[in-house]
């Protein structure tokens, strides 16, 4: 339901946007655009979805610290997430000097090769500049058998 909506009504909108972009760049438009939709079991465990939620909240003028804490709580409440790290950088709260702030909850073993870590990067466009958002989620270790 987040991207496509109920009964796939958003799929037609996405197809129209793709054809519009292809017309703009004067590319050859195929007769039929095939769109494969995969359902994500737990959307709150996906780093990309969490980063997009944070960007939306910041663009709605929500304070960045509250946004970071809400994103972390949603992720940790989700099934299978053992740790999360959220970093935001830029002119936070419209300050003169840009800075970087981050929060971490749980474990994020970035140096462990078998760690199942999902990473996403997103930008929030605000009147006083862009804010970069990075999200790491740790879902346990991968074991090849």
Regions found by a protein language model. Name each.
Residues 1-145:
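RNA-contacting regions in translation and RNA-metabolism proteins
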């Amino acid at each position: 339901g987040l991207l496509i909506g109920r009964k796939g009504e958003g799929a037609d909108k996405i197809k129209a946007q793709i054809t519009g972009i292809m017309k703009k760049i004067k590319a050859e438009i195929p007769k039929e655009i095939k769109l494969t939709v995969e359902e994500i079991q737990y959307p709150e465990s996906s780093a990309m979805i969490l980063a997009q939620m944070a960007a939306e909240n910041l663009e709605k003028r929500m304070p960045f610290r509250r946004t970071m804490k809400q994103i972390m709580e949603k992720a940790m409440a989700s099934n299978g997430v053992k740790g999360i790290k959220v970093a935001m950088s830029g002119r936070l709260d419209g300050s003169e000097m840009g800075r970087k702030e981050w929060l971490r909850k749980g474990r994020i073993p970035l140096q462990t090769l078998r760690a199942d870590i999902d990473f996403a990067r997103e930008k929030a466009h605000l009147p006083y500049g862009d804010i970069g958002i990075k999200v790491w989620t740790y879902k346990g270790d991968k074991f090849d058998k």
